[in-house]
């Protein structure tokens, strides 16, 4: 992996519709781009093909109603989940995609949320669509909190990773996210990104189940008009389990002396057998005590 990247997607249709579409949002401050993204998703899930205009940020405890293409949407503030994210998923093996294929298929439950880091490049001669979806194989409704951001498609694979990370960190620091309801047997598409040849997409996604049993996370790439790849063609990247994906580091600096701070430690085993150095997808907080 060349960058601290991020991204995702997968195909789905779903008979999922609210009588009055409602967008449930969490966060001390929900950035304008995420308000727009969450509202756009709810419209799509309700079968409404229209673009949501640029939005104002959503302040703490603030709700409002949007009128988009003749449809009223209610933005409702809700509390963020108590569950922790303890599983790190890396979708970067393969990094280069040349045809329709599955990239990640993973089941998770209430015992630990997931953080997906993804970074992929279209090396085919035509267009490719990258999809991310959540599906509920159970017999009861599943409620899932998601917080995700992406960047691209662009040609600069270093730049796209940094932009995606910056956008996601704005959500992370504010606990900004969207609470979604997945009916039994239902699927919801979270993201679809269309890449031209040589373009790259990158992104991060956190998902925590607040109610229900296991939920499936899928990432796949398809050529326009082609069916979703069979499950047996998926090649998962590595999955790491931690007590926490947040690390606190405290060090003391004494005037007149030098101090070295290191970021990332440990050697992870990538799915292709190669070693990667560093702690991709983890948050490090440094406290420097001056004496």
Report residues per predicted region.
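Intrinsically disordered, low-complexity Pro/Gly/Ser/Thr-rich segments with frequent PxxP/GP/PP motifs
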Residues: 162-198
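Solvent-exposed, low-complexity, repeat-rich "mucin-like" stalks and linkers
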Residues: 18-42
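Asparagine-centered strand-capping/turn motif at beta-strand->loop junctions
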Residues: 120-128, 133-152, 209, 289-291
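Short aromatic-acidic-glycine turn motif
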Residues: 79-85, 140, 150-167
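A eukaryote-biased signal for short, well-structured alpha-helical docking elements
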Residues: 70, 74-108, 226-264
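Terminal connector regions
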Residues: 197-233
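Short, solvent-exposed loop/turn segments enriched in Ser/Thr/Gly
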Residues: 51-56, 124-131, 199-203, 280-286
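Serine/threonine-rich, repeat-prone extracellular segments and beta-strand-based repeat modules
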Residues: 37-62, 66
């Amino acid at each position: 992996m060349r960058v601290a990247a991020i991204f995702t997607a997968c195909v789905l249709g779903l008979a999922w519709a609210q009588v009055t579409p409602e967008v449930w949002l969490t966060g001390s401050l929900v950035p304008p781009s995420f308000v727009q993204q969450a509202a756009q998703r709810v419209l799509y899930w309700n079968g409404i093909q229209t673009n949501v205009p640029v939005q104002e940020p959503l302040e703490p405890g603030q709700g409002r109603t949007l009128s988009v293409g003749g449809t009223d949407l209610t933005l409702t503030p809700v509390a963020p989940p108590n569950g922790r994210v303890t599983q790190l998923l890396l979708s970067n093996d393969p990094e280069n995609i040349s045809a329709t294929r599955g990239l990640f298929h993973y089941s998770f439950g209430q015992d630990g949320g997931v953080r997906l880091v993804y970074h992929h490049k279209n090396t085919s001669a035509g267009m490719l669509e990258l999809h991310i979806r959540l599906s509920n194989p159970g017999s009861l409704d599943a409620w899932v909190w998601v917080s995700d951001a992406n960047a691209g498609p662009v040609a600069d694979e270093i730049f796209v990773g940094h932009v995606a990370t910056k956008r996601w960190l704005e959500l992370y620091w504010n606990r900004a996210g969207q609470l979604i309801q997945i009916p039994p047997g239902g699927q919801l598409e979270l993201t679809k990104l269309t890449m031209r040849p040589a373009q790259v997409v990158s992104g991060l996604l956190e998902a925590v189940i607040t109610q229900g049993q296991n939920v499936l996370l899928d990432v796949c790439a398809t050529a326009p008009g082609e069916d979703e790849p069979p499950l047996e063609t998926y090649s998962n990247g590595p999955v790491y389990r931690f007590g926490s994906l947040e690390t606190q580091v405290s060090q003391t600096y004494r005037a007149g002396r030098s101090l070295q701070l290191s970021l990332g430690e440990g050697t992870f085993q990538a799915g292709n057998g190669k070693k990667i150095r560093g702690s991709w997808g983890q948050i490090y907080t440094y406290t420097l005590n001056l004496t």
